Amino acid sequence: MQTLFFTLIAFVAIILLMSIGFIIKKQSLKGSCGGLSTLGIAKACDCDKPCDTHHSKLDAGDEQAKAEYEQKFAKKDDDSQFYQVK
């Protein structure tokens, strides 16, 4: 029981010290070194239908948007229910 109490006090003290340091520096939180962009992922999209922005690109005749539409949203012959892992 003493070990549990000591561990709890240690965690609270560490969190308190980190919060004081954060307040003193007055810096905003920053992301890691690139996040998903370092993995080559532009953005995550699990939508069943394209959004308005994508529709406007398609209407404007953007070839890259058309290729992306075919890859993500066009119905395929196989009726698989799973996402493809890239």
Swiss-Prot record:
Q: Give the record's GO CC terms.
A: membrane
The UniProt transmembrane annotation reads 4-24
Residues folding into a coiled coil are none
Membrane topology category: Single-pass membrane protein
Task: Spell out the subcellular localization from the entry.
Answer: Membrane
Which key words tag this protein in UniProt? Membrane, Transmembrane, Transmembrane helix
Chief location bin = membrane
Q: Which InterPro entries match?
A: NqrM (IPR007495)
Pfam families membership: NqrM
* Protein name, UniProt field: Uncharacterized protein HI_0173
